[in-house]
Amino acid sequence: MPVGLVDHFNLVISPSQVDATLRFYCEILGLKEGFRPTFGRPGWWLYAGDHPVLHISLKEIAPTVGPTGSFDHIALNATDWPGMKTTLERHGVAFEEQLVRDNTVLQIFFRDPNGLRVELDYKLKA
C-alpha cells in the first residue's frame, strides 16, 4: 500500500476565470494544454512534459466556500489497492471508487481530517 509521488493537483475555478487561469499556467509556467478523458463536465488538463500535473475544473459557486478554498484535491499514485481498502475500512474512512474508462485507472477519493479531498490512483493491468 505504499504511496508514490504526487500525480496532479486539481484547481476549481469559476467560469469567468478560465482564460486568465489557462493563460497564467500555460504562458507563465510553461504548461501545455493536452488530452483529458471524457468526464461529462468541462475542464482542462495541463501537462509538464508528457504528464498532466494540473487539472482545472469549473464550478458556478464561489471557489472559496469549502474548507480548502480553491484547492480541491491532491492525487497520488499508489499500489496495493486491496491493502489500502482494508486500512481505510479499518479506520472508518469513507471512500468512493471511480474507474476512468479512458485510461484504465482506478481512482479512490476520501477526505483527510481537515476536509481536504485526497485521490489515490491505481493503475490497472491492461
Regions found by a protein language model. Give the residues of each.
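Vicinal oxygen chelate
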Residues: M1-G4, R90-A126
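Exposed loop/turn and edge beta-strand positions of beta-sandwich/beta-sheet ligand-binding modules
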Residues: G40, S70, T104
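Conserved N-terminal glycine/acidic-rich loop preference
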Residues: P2-L5, N10-V12, W44-Y47, I56, ...
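Mid-chain, well-packed structural core segment of small domains
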Residues: P67-T86
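N-terminal beta-strand motif that seeds the catalytic metal site of vicinal oxygen chelate
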Residues: M1-L22, D72-I74, A126
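Short beta-strand
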Residues: F35-T38, D72, Q98-V100
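Core segments of cupin and vicinal oxygen chelate
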Residues: L11-V53
